[in-house]
From Swiss-Prot:
Gene: hslO
Posttranslational mods: Under oxidizing conditions two disulfide bonds are formed involving the reactive cysteines. Under reducing conditions zinc is bound to the reactive cysteines and the protein is inactive.
Protein's UniProt keywords contain Zinc: yes
Name of the molecule in the record: 33 kDa chaperonin
Residues annotated as signal peptide: none
The organism of origin for this protein: Clostridium perfringens (strain SM101 / Type A)
Any one GO biological process: protein refolding
First-listed, main subcellular location of the protein, grouped into a coarse class: cytoplasm
S-S bridge residues: 239-241, 272-275
Length: 316
């Protein structure tokens, strides 16, 4: 069964729903980053959340980035998502390995993430400055943290479920999630009814493991609530790195650091955080970048001198 994301509404548009199965996507990411089960669960939950938040974007020029770091052994997770339901991400420590949570017997994502930090959401909407929202970590389990973010930072009461079920061979057996939001004007009793229903249902990964599709999961939750599925898409893990982008990253470091790399004379290998693709740079390659950096600095100095001269002329 392939991955799928659906957008839906219920109760005459008073409830907005994003729901997705991301089993293949998370499995691919876990393989790319060589994740332990705990790391796969943490990264997978964030990727699933990112997929749905990307689907909330209005245009293909908009981008959303999620970052969570609570000081735990996972060393933070970063995910970037786009409006076409493509997503990429990485975890600081893909080999974090912890005992199961003693309270529920599940992978201990909360401890891996930690609680001494925050969840940050950065939305680049094509404006001069990006929107940045940040909340302290609520539990480190990610779903609860994201629900807290929506309520506290965007003032949208939301229920969030994120699940990753890892098989014995460390492959991803099932992964998925949903974000259910009460829109302005919704009756308080509707929120109470929704809370009651969500408290009574099995976990999302349990339902997916039983063979339910993501549509069937949502139909089960919203039975008798005038559910309307509006759109279906296929989420995918996609990295858009390129040699040109890596070169720009090298050019962005200080002149002194770039000169040191050149003087060392060694071949440098830089890896993309998101897909682990390696880009190699010879001394000659770095020399060309150094020349470009020197020209850029010279142009900046020349421009500043022109401005200073113009200023002096205006004084006279």
């Amino acid at each position: 069964m392939s991955d799928k994301l659906i957008r839906a509404i219920a109760k005459d548009g008073m409830i907005r729903i994003f729901a997705t199965e991301t089993t293949e996507l998370v499995n691919e990411a876990s393989k790319i980053h060589d994740c332990t089960p705990t790391a796969a669960a943490a990264l997978g939950r964030m990727l699933t959340a990112g997929t749905m938040m990307g689907a909330m974007l209005k245009s293909d020029k908009e981008v959303v980035t999620l970052q969570i770091n609570g000081g735990g052994m996972a060393k933070g997770v970063t995910v970037t998502a786009y409006s076409d339901c493509s997503v990429k991400g990485y975890i600081g420590n893909p080999h974090v390995d912890l005992p199961l949570n003693t309270e529920n017997g599940k992978l201990n994502v909360g401890e891996a993430i930690g609680k001494n930090g925050g969840l940050t959401v950065i939305k680049d909407l094509g404006l001069k400055d990006p929107y940045v929202g940040q909340v302290p970590i609520y539990s480190g389990e990610i779903a609860e943290d994201l629900a807290y973010y929506f309520t506290a930072s965007e003032q949208i009461p939301s229920a969030v479920a994120l699940g990753v079920l890892v098989d014995r061979d460390h492959s991803i057996k099932k992964a998925g999630g949903f974000i259910i939001q009460l829109l302005p004007g919704a009756d308080e009793l509707l929120g109470d009814l929704l809370t009651y229903r969500l408290d009574e249902i099995p976990s999302l990964t349990t339902m997916l493991s039983e063979g339910k599709t993501i549509e069937e999961v949502i139909e089960f939750i919203f039975d008798g609530m005038d559910l309307k599925i509006l759109e279906e898409e296929t989420p995918k893990y996609k990295c858009d790195c390129s040699r040109e982008k890596v070169e720009r990253a090298l050019l962005s470091i200080g002149y002194k650091d770039l000169k040191e790399l050149y003087d060392e004379g060694k071949e440098e290998e830089l890896k993309c955080h998101f897909c682990n693709k390696a880009y190699k740079f010879t001394k000659e390659d770095i020399g060309k970048l150094l020349e470009e950096k020197e020209k850029s600095i010279a142009d900046e100095v020349s421009e500043e001198m022109k401005k200073a001269e113009e200023k002096e002329k205006n004084k006279k």
